[in-house]
A protein has these predicted regions:
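A sequence/structural signal for flexible, mid-protein segments enriched
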Residues: 19-268
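Positively charged n-region of N-terminal signal peptides that target proteins for export
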Residues: 1-5
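C-terminal motif of bacterial Sec signal peptides marking the signal peptidase cleavage site
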Residues: 14-17
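Sec-dependent N-terminal signal peptides
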Residues: 6-10
Length: 268
């Protein structure tokens, strides 16, 4: 997306008012394939039901913000066992399977064929630590009078771990994302808090009694941790006049047939 500026110039003349309308063509990038492929294994389930989302990027001012991809071929292969899992086209941008077999520590390869071009990516299924406690308090946040949600987990010792924590409360348009590296918490119990600071300009309100918060906690690879860090940093700094111009983030999905045709999104 190219940045643009709207500049208003008022010229005052005695007895004269003149308005010039200038139309400027904003260059548009070609549509790119966007791959949202998160193979998540929720504790207490078999992990057999998985969904991969495919869409194409759209111009910033387009009326249709999401353009689902139909007719693609999607396959995931366990590179350790050779097992293949075909994801069926649901004709709405979703590709699903109900027979996926997750194996912690195994490496999986994604293959997407779209417009006669092949996109591939590989990722290892990473374990996640157990959540020890979830509680509310008013002690750990910035505002000592505001409610916050706390999540405590144990980090295994002498193992390099990376985590992804997602909070989404009632009425939130977007979730709050946290990426965590265990460099300074290795082998220890760690608590992270989620607090909503009231902001009238952004229509953000503090947590209210009875409000529900959805919490998801993932183990992730170092590569995905680094991708998330860039993604979150760009989002949080996008409103600052001193922040660098955002650039499209390219994940781990590579076009084998035409490397110059990049894909957005990530396979994990």
């Amino acid at each position: 997306m190219k940045p643009f500026y709207i500049i208003y110039i008022c010229l005052l003349f005695v007895g004269v008012s003149c308005t010039d309308v200038i139309e400027v063509d904003v260059p548009e990038a070609p549509p790119r394939l966007t791959i949202e492929a998160s193979l998540d294994w929720e504790q207490g389930t078999s992990g057999s039901d998985q969904t991969i989302l495919l869409s194409t990027s759209t111009p910033y001012f387009a009326e249709q913000k999401i353009a689902p991809v139909l007719g693609a071929s999607v396959r995931v292969t366990n590179e350790d066992s050779g097992a293949e899992f075909i994801f069926e086209d649901q004709n709405n941008g979703e590709y699903t399977t109900s027979n996926f077999i997750p194996v912690i520590g195994d490496t999986y390869a994604l293959e997407v064929i779209y417009n006669d071009e092949r996109y591939t990516a590989t990722e290892t299924l990473v374990p996640v630590s157990d959540i020890v406690d979830v509680f509310q308090s008013t002690e750990g946040g910035e505002d000592k009078d505001a409610l916050e949600v706390n999540v405590t987990f144990d980090d295994p010792a002498d193992i390099e771990n990376y985590y992804f924590l997602r909070f989404k409360s009632d009425g939130d348009l977007f979730p709050e994302l946290y990426y965590i590296k265990d460099e300074f918490i290795d082998g220890n119990e760690f608590t992270i808090y989620y607090e909503k600071i009231e902001d009238e300009d952004d229509a953000i309100k503090e947590f209210q009694p009875g409000e529900t918060v959805d919490i998801a906690f993932y183990g992730i690879s170092k590569q995905y941790h680094d991708y998330l860090r860039l993604l979150v940093d760009q989002y949080e700094n996008s409103g600052s006049p001193f922040s660098p111009t955002p650039v499209p983030l390219v994940g781990n999905c590579v076009n084998i047939d035409n490397p110059n045709t990049i894909a957005y999104g990530y396979f994990r």
